[in-house]
């Protein structure tokens, strides 16, 4: 209850007052009002006002908020006298204020540290007309009647109102205690003319009296058995008399308005209408109410017909792609082709639309697969959505959960579309090769419908249970390897392989992207020293050994962190970082190509392997010792690799005479083939010619050239069969310092994928038979060998010549 001040002389009000905005609260002159003030600005205002005049100007905000906006303040406020102040925890202050007079802002003087303004003070005139007195009596009588009808207004309020001599203050008292909206109370406060103010209050009193009369009648008709029902009827009657609808009806009306604006497809629209009708008949307290409302929110919020316009300027799109990524020409061309097709179709038919291709980027970590998706979205002018699928084992993550489950939601595909806000985003499915199969189903199988151009026109999420058109989206998948992707899923995607970068490409990427990015991230910007080309080359060769550039960027970041530490300590920074400085900044080198290859040895041959992280150099060792013909294979070899070793042994036996090897070596010797890095599992057929070369090197006591690397499958007749991963393997050979690479002749078309720089640095020899391999791998030796004598201690593992 708000009560007026006792009659006393009004205090002197300063012309300049601090301004305190209020949310949904109106203070009338002569009334008490408790306030809780928080926020550093407003607490400071109250503290300083309490020490000075104890007066502040309070105005209601027309739009609730936290800051100060003079345009968002009501036209009229009140002078508030601080009567009592109490500090609360967390820095807030509780104050009790008394309204003194109406004020209006004439001029805003300052806004910092808190707003202060020059105000105009409005007081009610002392002498009033007879008409005003009559209106005041009518208002008092109506107010006393409402106090009798209302269960919330105390009877003492009638005495206070009767003792209020000033008509203007009586109007303020009534407006402060009636159940009015803040906007209606502000309307009374804005009315400076007392007569007009009383008329407004009388209209509010009449409305309140009608409401209370309806309530009294409803209460009189109430019985025990009908209590709950009648209470609802009473509320509805009040709302109808006010010309308002209840919250439930307003919510239904809002849903219907959103349905009209959403422009849903026919099937989705019918489902939404059915669900809204069901919701309309359901009481808001029902358990199913929230479930149905959440479903409708998803259905109406989805961008069924909201699309972003494609950027069809091919030159600009190409420029954006080149800005973000170096090289990757094949992928860039594929995106430009899609844009070109889209542009031509639109020229033929304005409503025509090309279905988005479903691309799959396969390559080792750090080559830019994920970041390429963002670049493609920017080039196309589309929204970008990324969903990480690594470790997902429940197909409901893709297809959504049925609404019968508690907490059910749509799958990640529909959630991503909703997050994008358009039905044609660039949608990246990251790490699609790392999906898991669990007892909840196979998520890879669930992706078949998403990624099939013939089916995703009407993709049905289990939660929505209505078709949604995914064909406008441009789906991009990423994977480190394609052999772990189910064949049916792989068949629906256009595979684009991203091999590792060459040294020159890494240098260019460093210059264009990595160095500047790390400078900014480490807080150096333009103060950072330049890293010379020699230092970058040494970084690439001796401190990293990867197909991508992720570790290289980490090393560059480590260099600039050292420089940032020096700068923070006030030490001078060098102008540049050169190759010799890397030992102090990064420690000793981690890799050395010359150490990796080493000296030519008997029984040790350099092979090439493909791994999910790119190509790698693989050494195969073979030793021959006296024994009874036992073959030992070590190094965690898979079944295919073991079969390659047996095929190599059979080939060596069949060619023993031609190779000047005793034909009975398989009966008098034990053979041990080992592939180092024994803790790492290895498999695949491409090490066949490498194993055969190592075995023949050991049997003939001929050293093998370490700078010659090879890959290829071998048959029992010595033919060299094609293999995969040619580009990755050749790039790995280049990183290791290999000078010659032997490849199956059938892989000749794959050489077109190699960078020109690689073809110039490495001598690539195409072979069809082991007879072409051995002369290029083994040192020449004319002597024959004898295998029956035991090998001396210093020659263990080799066959001595006789």
Curated annotation (Swiss-Prot):
N-terminal signal peptide: none
Enzyme class: hydrolase
Gene Ontology annotations of biological process type: cellular response to heat; protein quality control for misfolded or incompletely synthesized proteins
SUPFAM superfamilies, alphabetized: P-loop containing nucleoside triphosphate hydrolases (SSF52540), PUA domain-like (SSF88697), Ribosomal protein S5 domain 2-like (SSF54211)
Residues binding ATP, per UniProt: 363-370
Residue intervals of the Lon N-terminal domain: 17-209
Reactions the enzyme catalyzes: Hydrolysis of proteins in presence of ATP
Glycoprotein among keywords: no
Subunit comment: Homohexamer. Organized in a ring with a central cavity.
Matching NCBIfam families: lon (TIGR00763)
PANTHER family cross-referenced by the UniProt entry: ATP DEPENDENT LON PROTEASE FAMILY MEMBER
Similarity comment text for this entry: Belongs to the peptidase S16 family.
Protein name: Lon protease
Biological source species: Roseiflexus castenholzii (strain DSM 13941 / HLO8)
């Amino acid at each position: 209850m708000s009560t007026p001040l006792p009659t006393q002389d009004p205090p002197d009000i300063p012309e300049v007052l601090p301004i305190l905005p209020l949310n949904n609260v109106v203070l009338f002159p002569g009334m008490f009002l408790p306030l809780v003030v928080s926020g550093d600005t407003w607490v400071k205002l109250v503290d300083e006002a309490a020490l000075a005049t104890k007066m502040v100007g309070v105005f209601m905000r027309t739009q609730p908020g936290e800051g100060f906006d003079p345009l968002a303040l009501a036209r009229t406020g009140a002078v508030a006298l601080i009567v009592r102040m109490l500090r609360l925890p967390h820095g807030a202050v509780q104050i009790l204020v008394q309204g003194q007079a109406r004020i209006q802002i004439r001029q805003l003087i300052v806004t910092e540290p808190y707003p202060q303004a020059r105000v105009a003070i409005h007081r009610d005139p002392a002498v009033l007309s007879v008409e005003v007195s009559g209106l005041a009596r009518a208002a008092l009588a109506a107010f006393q009647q409402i106090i009798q009808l209302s269960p919330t207004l105390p009877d003492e309020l009638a005495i206070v109102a009767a003792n209020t001599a000033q008509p203007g203050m009586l109007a303020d008292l009534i407006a402060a205690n009636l159940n009015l909206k803040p906007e209606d109370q502000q309307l009374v406060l804005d009315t400076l003319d007392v007569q007009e103010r009383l008329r407004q209050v009388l209209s509010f009193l009449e409305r309140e009296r009608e409401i209370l009369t309806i309530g009294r009648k409803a209460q009189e008709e109430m019985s025990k058995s009908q209590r709950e029902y009648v209470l609802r009827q009473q509320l509805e009657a009040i709302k109808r008399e006010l010309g308002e609808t209840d919250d439930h009806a307003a919510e239904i009306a809002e849903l219907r308005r959103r349905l009209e604006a959403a422009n849903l497809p026919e099937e989705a629209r019918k489902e939404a209408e059915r669900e809204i009708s069901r919701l309309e008949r359901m009481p808001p307290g029902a358990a199913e109410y929230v479930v149905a409302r959440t479903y409708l929110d998803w259905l109406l919020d989805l961008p069924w017909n909201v699309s972003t316009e494609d950027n069809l300027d091919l030159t600009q799109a190409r420029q954006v792609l080149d800005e973000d990524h170096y090289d990757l020409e094949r992928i860039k061309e594929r995106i430009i082709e899609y844009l070109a097709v889209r542009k031509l179709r639109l020229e033929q038919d304005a409503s025509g639309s090309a279905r988005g291709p479903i691309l799959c980027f396969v390559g080792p970590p750090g080559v830019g697969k994920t970041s390429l998706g963002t670049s493609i979205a920017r080039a196309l002018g589309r929204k970008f959505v990324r969903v990480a699928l690594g470790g997902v084992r429940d197909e409901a993550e893709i297809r959504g959960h049925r609404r019968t489950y508690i907490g059910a939601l749509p799958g990640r595909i529909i959630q991503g579309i909703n997050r994008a806000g358009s039905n044609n985003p660039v949608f990246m499915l990251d790490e699609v090769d790392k999906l898991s199969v669990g007892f909840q189903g196979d998520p890879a199988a669930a992706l078949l419908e998403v990624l099939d151009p013939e089916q995703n026109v009407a993709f049905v999420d289990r939660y929505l249970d209505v078709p949604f058109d995914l064909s406008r989206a441009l789906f991009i998948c990423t994977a480190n390897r394609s052999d772990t992707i189910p064949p049916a899923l792989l068949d629906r995607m256009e595979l684009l392989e991203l091999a590792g970068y060459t040294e020159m490409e890494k240098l260019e990427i460093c210059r264009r992207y990595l160095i500047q990015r790390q400078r900014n991230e480490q807080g150096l910007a333009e103060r950072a020293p330049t890293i010379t080309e020699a230092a970058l080359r040494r970084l690439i060769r001796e401190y990293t050994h990867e197909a991508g550039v992720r570790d290289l960027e980490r090393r560059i970041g480590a260099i600039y962190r050292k420089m940032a530490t020096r700068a923070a300590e006030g030490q001078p920074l060098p102008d540049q970082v050169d190759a010799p400085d890397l030992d102090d900044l990064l420690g000793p080198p981690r890799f050395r190509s010359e150490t990796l290859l080493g000296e030519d040895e008997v029984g040790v041959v350099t092979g090439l392997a493909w791994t999910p992280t790119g190509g790698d150099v693989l050494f195969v060792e073979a030793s021959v010792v006296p024994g009874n013909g036992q073959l030992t294979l070590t190094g965690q070899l898979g079944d295919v690799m073991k079969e390659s070793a047996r095929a190599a042994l059979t080939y060596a036996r069949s060619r023993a005479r031609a190779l000047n090897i005793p034909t009975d070596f398989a009966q008098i010797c034990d053979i041990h083939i080992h592939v180092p890095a024994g803790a790492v599992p290895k498999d695949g057929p491409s090490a066949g010619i490498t194993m055969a070369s190592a075995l023949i090197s050991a049997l003939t006591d001929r050293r093998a050239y370490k700078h010659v690397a090879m890959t290829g499958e071998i048959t029992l007749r010595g033919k060299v069969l094609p293999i995969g991963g040619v580009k990755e393997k050749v790039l790995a050979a280049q990183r290791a310092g290999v000078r010659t690479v032997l490849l199956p002749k059938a892989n000749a078309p794959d050489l077109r994928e190699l960078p020109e720089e690689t073809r110039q640095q490495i001598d690539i020899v195409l072979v069809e038979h082991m007879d072409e391999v051995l002369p290029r791998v083994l040192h020449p030796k004319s002597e024959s060998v004898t295998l029956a004598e035991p090998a001396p201690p210093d020659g263990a593992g080799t066959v001595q010549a006789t």
